[in-house]
């Protein structure tokens, strides 16, 4: 899923570009799936979850965002938590963090004969 999102990151948000040379960024609290920059150049921490994401996923990405903010010496960090869906606790927690966006993914198969 991470590879597919990297290839199609512009579908997540217009003019977004990965900023991590295709490698997960290591911070004190773990490994960030994708570090990107938005159209304004602001850093965006992207965490991917297959299936349902809960409040632990929100805590995880907030930890990553805090680590990046400290490393980069800026509070101008955005977060995008990408999952198939989010439980009530994740949605409630994310409402309190304006710089964090919950994004649902879907996919469809395309087939062609070889």
Please report, for each region that a protein language model flagged, where it lies by residue.
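Charged, terminal alpha-helix-loop-beta segments
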Residues: 1-114
């Amino acid at each position: 899923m991470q590879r597919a999102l990297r290839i199609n990151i512009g579908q997540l948000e217009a003019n977004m570009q990965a900023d991590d040379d295709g490698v997960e960024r290591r911070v004190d609290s773990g490994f960030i799936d994708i570090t990107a920059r938005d159209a304004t150049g602001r850093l965006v921490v992207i965490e991917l979850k297959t299936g349902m994401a809960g409040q632990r996923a929100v805590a995880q990405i907030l930890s990553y965002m805090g680590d990046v903010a400290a490393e980069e010496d800026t509070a101008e960090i955005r977060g995008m938590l990408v999952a198939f869906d989010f439980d009530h606790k994740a949605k409630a927690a994310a409402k309190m963090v304006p710089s964090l966006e919950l994004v649902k993914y879907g996919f469809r198969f395309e087939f062609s004969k070889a």
